[in-house]
């Protein structure tokens, strides 16, 4: 309503973009079925920078900031696809989970190699200015 994109749908767009990345690094839908492992989001920080309206074209970028054997930290930006401005950002910490045991588990070697290649490529990009921000009331 109000002619703009509701805040929940920003997260849907970010999540759909991550699904594409998961396929690239080998932890997509087939991986869940085959390996019985998945990912759970442990923390997310979304910033709503500029309003999108219904039917605005969008594009999402993904930047891997860091990873270890059981988790990865990434930053996404949602852009108006034709005008180029940033509408929202999303910073996430994601855990790799053994679905049978329901506990955090190590990535397989193939995924670790994919993450290492991606991090090396993304390390060439500038770190997003908004990465690592926190919510707080300014001191008075």
Question: Can you name each region flagged by the protein language model?
Answer:
Residues 2, 6, 58-60, 94:
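Short beta-strand segments
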Residues 21-72, 87:
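Hydrophobic beta-strand-centered segment that forms part of the acyl-chain substrate-binding groove
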Residues 65-95:
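Mid-chain, well-packed structural core segment of small domains
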Residues 1-41, 98-140:
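Hot-dog-fold acyl-thioester-processing enzymes
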Residues 15-16, 28, 46, 54, ...:
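A generic structural signal for solvent-exposed, polar alpha-helical segments
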């Amino acid at each position: 309503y109000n002619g703009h994109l509701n805040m929940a749908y920003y997260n849907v767009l970010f999540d759909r973009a991550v699904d594409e990345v998961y396929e690239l690094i080998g932890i997509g839908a087939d991986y869940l079925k085959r390996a019985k492992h998945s990912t759970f989001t442990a923390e997310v920080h979304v910033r709503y920078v500029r309003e999108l309206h219904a039917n605005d074209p969008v594009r999402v970028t993904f930047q891997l900031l860091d990873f270890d054997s059981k988790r990865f930290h990434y930053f996404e930006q949602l852009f108006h696809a034709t005008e180029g401005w940033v509408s929202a950002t999303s910073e996430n910490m994601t855990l790799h989970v053994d679905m049978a045991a329901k506990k955090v588990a190590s990535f397989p070697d193939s995924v670790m190699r994919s993450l290492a290649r991606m991090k090396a490529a993304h390390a060439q990009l500038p770190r997003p200015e908004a990465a690592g921000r926190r919510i707080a009331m300014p001191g008075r």
